[in-house]
Amino acid sequence: EKTEDSFYVSVQSKSATDIDQKGIAVCIADLVDLNIKKILKKIQKIEPYAEFQNLHILLDGALKTSLKVGNQKTIIKGDEKELLISLASVYAKVTRDTYMKKISKNPKYSQYGFEVHKGYGTLNHRRAIQRGGLSDEHRRSFCGRL
């Protein structure tokens, strides 16, 4: 009998406003559950009678899910230890960087240089915030000390 392994990834994000209002920990927990639910839906479309008890869910760092599905494993520094977590991490980063490049074309954000630093806390990004203030893409809870 031939078995086939599959790798599924889902990337979702929360707005800066959501993160500031609910807190980063709550938003991350919500996103972990949301992503797992989206992956389960993808699997059910491909295999309508899939049994999820054989599903292996790898979570990086201290991530946890409230969902009682599959065989879940949390791995500290998982992106250094598990190839699949590394791949998912790169996929998420590229997705975020692509989004930042896209919004950098909007005149509303042109002063921030998102196309260069993609929102990471570089010196040029911090200087742009000091010159122009925070935009709705900035987490005030994170940028408070600028």
Regions found by a protein language model. Give the residues of each.
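RNase H-like, Mg2+-dependent phosphodiesterase core
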Residues: 1-146
